[in-house]
Amino acid sequence: MRTKKQNFFLFLKIFAAIMVLILGGLYYFRDALLQQVIAKAETKFQTDYNCHFSVKKANFNGLSEVELHNILLVPQNADTLLAVQNIKTSYSFLELLTGDLQLNNLEMNNGFIQLVKNKNGRNFDAFLKRDNQEKSAEKRNYAKLAYRILSKVLNLVPSEMQLKNLALRTDDMGRKVVFQLNNLQLEDKKLQSDIIVKTAALTQNWKISGFADPRDKKADLKFSSNDTTKIQVPYIDERFGLKSSFDNIQVKLDKLEMESGELHIDGFTSIQNFTLNHPKVARKDVVIENARFNYRFLLGSDFISVDSTSSAQLNHIKVKPFAEYNTEEDTIYKLKVALPKMKAQDFITSLPKGLFTNFEGMEAEGTFDYQLDFEYNKNKPNKLVFDSKLNKENLRILKYGAANLAKLNGEFTYRAIENGVEQRPILVGAANPNFTPLDQISPFLEKAVLTNEDPSFFHHRGFINEAFKQSIVKNIRTKKFARGASTISMQLVKNVFLTREKTLSRKLEEILLVYILENNRIASKSRMLEVYFNVIEWGPNVYGIGEASQFYFQKSPSELSLSECLYLASIVPKPKKFMWQFDGEGNQKSYAVKNQKYIKNLMLRRALITDLDTIGQSVPIYISGKARSFLKLNTVVDSTVTDSISFDPDEFDF
């Protein structure tokens, strides 16, 4: 009778014999098995993607090296998607036995991938279709899913690689770009490549070099030009009119690991001398000399986040960001930004050139820090959190740039800009007979305009957090910038110091200039409002209340009635379209009357006016000045004509 030890060794012998038979069978039938795999792939491409896939010749060299010749992938009635003359690769047999395909070596020569979009469609559409299979009711685990995908991708990146004469060709309705990879070599964890990029307008020589270890999941790669020129990003200039270039980009991956059920991805990326040009961004080139992002991405079972230990740097400006998408209970978006204490002058000199032209040459002293806290619950949008806080210490402007905010306190010349063209000069000062001091303007006008435009003007510091919150909620709901949150301070800065161009640059400058104006007490609130009333547009080529009161009513600003002030306040958002408020008889249409009544009722509720002030105000306003010539009046009154314009409550957003 055999002992347990003898039985164990017998089992090992039998197991070894079976493994030898299996390996021998695999070795003997390896080419036949390879043909079956290729045939299965051909069938899948045909049935699932309506594509013809073929390999002219395929064979094994030994047990773990495969060689393929003349590989083609051609969608039906479309341009060839892929063609490669020769592929030779080896894989880890032991890893394959565990269910993971891990490539050790890869050689690929003479081929291309081609992405085409033309009037007949796209040659890659079949690969973008959605999977119609029912989704599992099981909650998705972001960490496990991401780690599984990234691990499989990195396993398919060989530890040794040589690619020669390969190309990526793109053709988007005639906009063609060719990325020609003459040679890419990965050996002893060192990557070196040369790429020629061709478009209709230019030819560039790029290179990628550095350290790459797909098995240890680490890399440190630098992307730059082979000569002294900057890399120009192709395609997007032709497609979107966005011109961009840079000296080099560096990407480093230090860590990609699962720890306690969370996926950690650590590293950094940086860019040097990044230049951007687009008419929606700024009038001139925007230049970022140095930018760096030290990242730590964390993925858990129900969240994806940029960890608070991450940091971003723009020249001398350092930021500590935190962002999170969380689905544990509700769908919640979080964003926190902390700008540690820094010198004000370092902040000014670090701003991207071309994006803040009015700040160029500005000098300041003192320090400040900043915190932003934002949280949005998709299921509870009205509970949005938006908290912005800036702390300053001995902050003082020593010298202004192009925008001299101090000029608000004295006499100056204002020129409105229409379609990029300066309009006639308006002198803001006593030498202008139309200039009207604040105490000589009807108090009804001040109260009506503030009620309609900025009720808390005398109390805020340029911005209204609650208005921003409402604006954000509405923009998210409508998925577009449907609502703004502009204060009188912002309107004043925009009118006096900036152009009317709708660019990112102009909006960012507006925000910063308003903050400086309001928080450094450069001009009093009363003076700001006085300038505002004397420069804003109140009709076609009508600027300031002095001109407006004569243009509409042939009165001085102090003589305006409550009804006339309500009318003037109501047309501030769209002054050039005032004539559409009136019918053919010169009377205000019902929607305009309703809007002005709404403003009046708000003023009553806020005790800005009394019931006595409204006595006699039911009489319709009469346009008696030059504005009457702009009205579409009937020469013969037709009593059958009805008002075709109905009240649109969304036309006036309070």
Language-model-derived ranges and their functions:
Residues 128-143, 404-430:
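Charged, glycine/proline-rich intrinsically disordered loops and linkers
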Residues 171-189:
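Short, solvent-exposed loop/hinge segments that bridge or flank secondary-structure elements
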Residues 1-50, 207-209, 218-224, 230-231, ...:
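N-terminal type II signal-anchor transmembrane helix
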Residues 151, 155-156, 418-608:
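Peptidoglycan glycan-strand catalytic modules in the bacterial/periplasmic cell-wall system
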Residues 65, 70-72, 104-114, 124, ...:
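Small-residue helix/turn framework positions
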